[in-house]
Amino acid sequence: MDILVPLLQLLVLLLTLPLHLMALLGCWQPLCKSYFPYLMAVLTPKSNRKMESKKRELFSQIKGLTGASGKVALLELGCGTGANFQFYPPGCRVTCLDPNPHFEKFLTKSMAENRHLQYERFVVAPGEDMRQLADGSMDVVVCTLVLCSVQSPRKVLQEVRRVLRPGGVLFFWEHVAEPYGSWAFMWQQVFEPTWKHIGDGCCLTRETWKDLENAQFSEIQMERQPPPLKWLPVGPHIMGKAVK
């Protein structure tokens, strides 16, 4: 099976050669940054419909995590189009962070559709460097389908712990690698070099549960879920929470 991977990767590369040439010349990334929000605006509602009950179950736990202000200070890391807003309890003070500024107009639309929330600001920055946010300033951090595409999950989780107050909670929902040695994992390996370009850096074979377990949270609760959109090469999902 391992012998097949480089051969099939080469075949996929040849079939998508223009994309890889554009990436090599530096033309693809700006284009990807522009179109990716539109792609997410199409895919996330479909995913939300599939996972609605589980998301409501996960995010219903936010309600009791109010800070000194009497409201929940919530940071959505890699906020994208704001697809999670509908699941947050009323009164949350939401700060949005994403490295892609092209998401802002989609966020504006989501804000208008979710008046039960209080919006603080949109920060354009990578998760590895959230210096614009103060230490211990957040009661809750939400991270959904983000750790697959960051440069360093370890650094992102360090920053998450820094901005969370003591007792603050990270809620996560991430796709991860299929079981090692399975045919599904083999196909993830085959598609990953091309998928990273299509998906704005998204990696198919990350073992994100290990990063969470090694991030020095005081408590972690985690469960695995099947992928909501089975026609995509993304694997099973992990959902849960981690307490600082």
From Swiss-Prot:
It holds the Pfam family Methyltransf_11. InterPro entries: Methyltransf_11, SAM-dependent_MTases_sf, Thiol_S-MT. One of its GO terms (molecular function) is S-adenosylmethionine-dependent methyltransferase activity. SUPFAM superfamilies: S-adenosyl-L-methionine-dependent methyltransferases (SSF53335). GO terms for cellular component: cytosol; endoplasmic reticulum membrane; lipid droplet. It is a peripheral membrane protein. Residues 1-23 form the signal peptide. CDD domains: AdoMet_MTases. Expressed in the liver. Belongs to the methyltransferase superfamily. Methylates drugs such as 7alpha-thiospironolactone, L-penicillamine and captopril. This is Thiol S-methyltransferase TMT1B. It comes from Homo sapiens. The lineage of its organism: Eukaryota, Metazoa, Chordata, Craniata, Vertebrata. The gene is TMT1B.
